[in-house]
Regions:
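Conserved thiamine diphosphate
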Residues: 1, 125, 129-143, 310-312, ...
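Structural signature of the thiamine diphosphate
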Residues: 1, 136, 146-182, 376-398, ...
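Glycine-/acidic-rich phosphate or pyrophosphate-binding loops and their flanking alpha/beta elements
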Residues: 27-50, 63, 179-192, 455-456, ...
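Active-site cofactor/cluster-binding pocket
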Residues: 86-91, 99-102, 106-117, 191-201, ...
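Conserved phosphate/anionic-ligand binding catalytic regions in large, soluble enzymes, centered on
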Residues: 195-215, 329-341, 475, 480-481, ...
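Ferredoxin-type iron-sulfur electron-transfer modules and their immediate structural context
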Residues: 354, 367-527, 534-619, 623-744, ...
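Thiamine diphosphate
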Residues: 569-570, 630-631, 640, 723-726, ...
């Protein structure tokens, strides 16, 4: 401390000199390439009276707006900040025209509690003592959360002379800071072509359009721009691709609101979103759908028909799903088909040349997946150009009635959820969230939102859905167990409930409980069509009880699910089949349902199972990653509640501090419950307390640390004291939500647990506290696109390991087991359902820290059989010895039993064949066979060494294999 201050100040001359040095190098760049970079660049009228000071991409929009306004005689300009730190006051002042009478500073950030945002404060300080010292300086916020900033909003800034502090892009009806914005302006250069593509997350639309804009930019004399707008769902969400190209530079850093070409890649969107209304008169609309003329007449909403007819829209259709099936691409990968159709209709490049370039791009993009995949894409490109059909628009469409769009709406349910859905979620899911005012969020300022709102979405995104045939069902409940989205559920109905069920519902007598009728409820509109359920169904005599059939043919059956899933849980059924079993657990409501996870996701079945076992008393701290995205994709929340209103309390802090965050949640519970425990003791020891109250207090205190029984004891305690004339009792009842022992979980992926958050995970496990860590091990950073982590095995190809990872996978389980007092398990659901349930139940019951590492197949693996076979892939991983299932339970050692159990059998099957079944490995074999042979051999040997080591643990802890 005696020298720190001086040492820090010694560098001042270097910072003081830096602006001049940067300008010197800018001058050299300018000389070489003809640019005009300065520390602060001015653009606009030479005699400007109102200047905006800003930095970043918004400056292009401001420049485009300035061109429009200056042409109309306005005296406006912009100063673009090129070097923010060190901030050169002299350079800023020199950049501002002498004629300026007002300055508006735009900041793309919010600093609550400050007198202004950073750039504004710097500008005010820089102007002090200059010739602009008395010039009014206004400050505005814009663009938070990627909020669109349009020319009309920039005009509002220039017209503002009253609000010294303001916002643009929103309607602030709470603090009234927002500026009124006029009608949308068209400020793009003449001849600019605007195209917008509406796709379904994971259908390839975004990837295809990235290729399209590269093709246009690289093979024409046009400038090109692309921007992709989509929600945070892992797949199945709405994607919008905005493409612009033209002969002049494009400065439009905002979304397209009027397009020359609009493509809808999912037919259900025509009933949900305003798409054709975005077209200019005479524009082109391409719809991917299976409908002929009669089908279009039946399915197109009246307002869509009327707009097409009255605005001279050229209308085309193509059946991308049919072409996808015919070419082997499958029903969901329609991207190259629609891309080919776009190039044919847009006529930017001659058709033959466009097809040639698309095929080259497809080879570059998919070549690592094999020649077969490339050939299918080429066939899809050819057919996409051939099978477009122009629709002759009937004259009658001009007078078609406006029927309104289908929107999310809640008519029943919990009051908090209904309010949230109808005021916020419905708008957001209809792509109208930008229209919501600030006041809509007045009840949610702390970031808390209601649980269970994903159930109101009913997206209907699957092409095919499971259809249940009771004749072939053995009531094993495996389909429900593996379903990533909780859309298929076994339901036990009483005779009265079965009689009251909607007509046509499929049922069968319930095995082992003759007083009940069994049905398999399927939510078609929440299904993603992955097919995992049908894949694992054992059926009878080789015939499965589940078949994947067209959603359109079974959409009307949604009412069966809505009825059955709303029936009360049968506690006697759960008791009969035991909740800690595969079958029994599925009779409990999943408290994670209808998430935004990918079809076939390997992570959500584990999380869903945990909520079925402990969800009514769970706290979850979730690391940023896939599990936080499917765990809470605003505005819909898939974590939900049971009929008592109990469910997981979920929160996400950051990526790197999640373990510490979860640990903090645990300590907070401990402190709160400790205070309540003391009060319960006071009540029990009171001479005035009735015996039944004392008994309830004693039961609560006796079960205080037992999560399995303390919940029931808590209910008895609250019931016993709720009407007591006692201040202490009233305080206990007031805080009843904190009374019961909670099940504290920490969720995250391998990128968090093995890499960035490892220090925190290690700290929490070392603490000895009763806390559970669940690692969804996909062996890559899944959420950010498949980067290598320390969980990535030798030879796997991933980002940052494009040539195959040279080093072996980190042995996280062994590190945790080295403490000796941490429960550790490795599981793979598809390999051993029972072991997965047992490990999760044991981990939660263990009175100390636990770590579960769950193998989770991911789309980044490139499973050649497809994600419908994710559970099969888990089975093969264990069967071949690639993954090992085991449990280390220190509590057993205290009982004189073996603490270690190796659940996996000795490896069998072809290890190399397993590796070659996934693109992440096979692509290396295609690119560099010799290297692949070396690394794959190393990978296999490492797997054998792991199994040898695990067998040594079996002997060390004194059990037979």
């Amino acid at each position: 401390p005696d020298i720190f201050f001086q040492a820090r100040e010694a560098c001042n001359p270097y910072y003081d000199a830096l602006p001049a040095i940067v300008q010197e190098y800018m001058d050299k760049v300018n000389e070489k390439i003809g640019t005009d970079y300065k520390l602060f660049n001015y653009y606009g009228a030479a005699d400007a009276e109102h200047v905006i000071i800003a930095m970043g991409s918004v400056c292009d929009t401001i420049e485009e707006t300035i061109d429009y306004l200056v042409a109309a005689g306005k005296k406006v300009g912009v100063v673009k900040v090129r070097l923010y730190r060190p901030f050169s006051a002299e350079a800023l002042i020199n950049a501002i025209p002498e004629t300026v009478k007002q300055i508006s500073v735009l900041d793309r950030t919010k600093e609550p509690g400050s007198l202004g945002e950073p750039l504004y404060l710097d500008v005010v300080a820089a102007l002090k003592g200059s010739r602009f010292e008395s010039t009014p300086v206004f400050t505005g916020r814009y663009g938070l959360g990627s909020k669109d900033t349009t020319p009309a909003q920039i005009v509002a800034v220039y017209e503002n002379t009253e609000k010294q502090r303001f916002t643009i892009g929103i309607v602030d009806d709470v603090t009234n800071l927002s500026l009124p914005v006029g009608a949308p302006l068209v400020t793009t250069p003449e001849g600019t072509i605007n195209c917008k593509f509406w796709g379904l997350g994971a259908d390839g639309t975004v990837g295809a359009n990235k290729n399209s804009i590269k093709i246009i930019g690289d093979n024409t004399d046009m400038y090109a721009q692309a921007y992709f707008d989509y929600d945070s769902k892992k797949s199945g969400g709405v994607t919008m691709s905005h493409l612009r190209f033209g002969k002049k530079p494009i400065k439009s850093t905002y979304l397209i609101h009027k397009a020359n070409f609009v493509a809808c890649h999912n037919p259900s969107y025509v009933n949900k979103y305003h798409m054709v209304e975005e077209l200019v008169d005479g524009g082109t609309f391409l719809l991917n759908c299976p409908w002929d003329e009669a089908g279009l007449e039946e399915h197109l909403p009246g307002q869509v028909k009327a707009f097409i007819a009255n605005h001279n829209i050229k209308f085309y259709v193509i059946d991308g799903v049919k072409i996808g099936i015919e070419t082997g691409m499958g029903p969901t990968r329609i991207n190259t088909i629609l891309q080919s159709a776009f190039f044919k209709l847009a006529k930017i490049i001659p058709e033959e040349k466009a097809i040639e370039l698309m095929k080259a791009a497809a080879k570059a993009t998919y070549g690592r997946k094999g020649d077969d995949v490339v050939a299918k894409n080429w066939a899809a490109i050819d057919e996409g150009a051939k099978q477009i059909k122009e629709v002759a628009v009937p004259e009658s469409w001009k007078n078609a009635a406006d029927e309104g769009l289908t929107t999310t709406h809640a008519e029943s349910g919990r009051a908090d959820a209904v309010k949230f859905v109808n005021t916020i979620q419905a708008k957001v899911t209809s792509q109208e969230g930008n229209n919501l005012p600030v006041s809509a969020f007045a009840d949610y300022v702390d970031g808390t939102t209601p649980s269970g709102t994903s159930a109101y979405e009913k997206r209907g995104i699957a092409v095919n859905v499971p259809v249940w045939n009771p004749e072939n069902c053995i009531q094993c409940n495996r389909c429900s167990f593996v379903c990533p989205h909780a859309v298929i559920r076994p339901v036990a109905m009483t005779a009265e409930e079965a009689a009251a069920a909607p007509e046509g519902i499929q049922t069968m007598p319930m095995t082992g409980m003759p007083d009940y009728t069994f049905t398999m409820a399927i939510s078609q509109l929440d299904c993603t069509g992955c097919g995992s359920c049908a894949n694992v169904c054992p059926g009878k005599k080789g015939v499965k009880a589940l078949a994947m059939e067209s959603l359109a043919a079974h959409e009307a059956e949604q009412k069966y699910f809505d009825y059955a899933a709303a029936l009360p849980e049968k506690t006697d059924v759960v008791a009969k089949f035991k909740e800690n079993t595969v079958k029994g657990s599925q009779f409990k409501k999943p408290l994670l349902e209808f998430s935004g996870a990918c079809a076939g996701c390997g992570e959500t079945p584990y999380a869903k199972l945990i909520t079925q076992l402990f969800g009514d008393r769970m706290y979850i701290a979730n690391a940023t990653g896939c599990s936080s995205i499917w765990g809470n994709s605003s505005p819909s929340t898939p974590y939900t509640v049971n009929e008592k209103g109990q469910g997981p309390a979920w929160s996400n802090s950051l990526f790197e501090d999640n373990a510490e965050f979860g640990y903090g949640m645990l300590l907070a519970q401990k402190a709160i419950r400790g205070g309540l425990k003391a009060k319960v003791e006071d009540v029990m020891n009171s001479e005035k307390a009735p015996e039944e109250v004392k008994a309830a207090c004693k039961e609560y205190l006796d079960t205080f640390d037992c999560g399995a029984t303390n919940g029931t004891a808590t209910e008895k305690l609250v019931e016993a004291i709720k009407d007591a004339d006692c201040d202490v009792c009233r305080d206990i009842v007031k805080n009843k939500d904190f009374l019961a022992k909670k099940s504290q979980w920490i969720f995250g992926g391998d990128g968090w647990a093995y890499d960035i958050g490892f220090g925190g995970v290690d700290h929490v496990l070392a603490s000895g506290k009763d806390i559970n860590v669940m690692v969804f091990d996909t062996e890559v950073y899944s959420n950010t696109g498949g980067q290598s982590s320390k969980a990535t095995p030798t030879g796997a190809v991933a980002q940052f390991a494009a040539g195959g990872k040279e080093t072996k996978k980190k042995d996280m389980a062994s590190i945790a087991m080295s403490y000796g007092y941490v429960y550790v398990a490795q599981i793979a659901m598809g390999a051993d359902y029972n072991q997965a349930v047992k490990a999760i139940a044991e981990a939660e019951a263990y009175p100390g820290p636990s770590l579960i590492i769950a193998y989770a197949p991911c789309i980044n693996h490139g499973i050649k059989k497809g994600m419908s076979k994710a559970q099969t892939e888990e089975q093969l991983a264990v069967q071949t010895g690639y993954w090992h299932c085991f449990r280390f339970n220190p509590a057993l050692a205290a009982e004189g039993k073996s603490a270690f159990t190796l659940d996996s059998k000795a490896p069998s099957g072809d290890y190399q064949e397993f590796l070659n079944g996934e693109v992440r490995y096979n692509s290396l074999k295609r690119a560099n066979p010799a290297k692949a042979e070396r690394l794959f051999g190393k990978n296999e040997q490492e797997a054998k060494d792991r199994y040898t080591y695990l067998n040594k643990l079996v002997k060390l802890y004194g059990t037979e294999e």
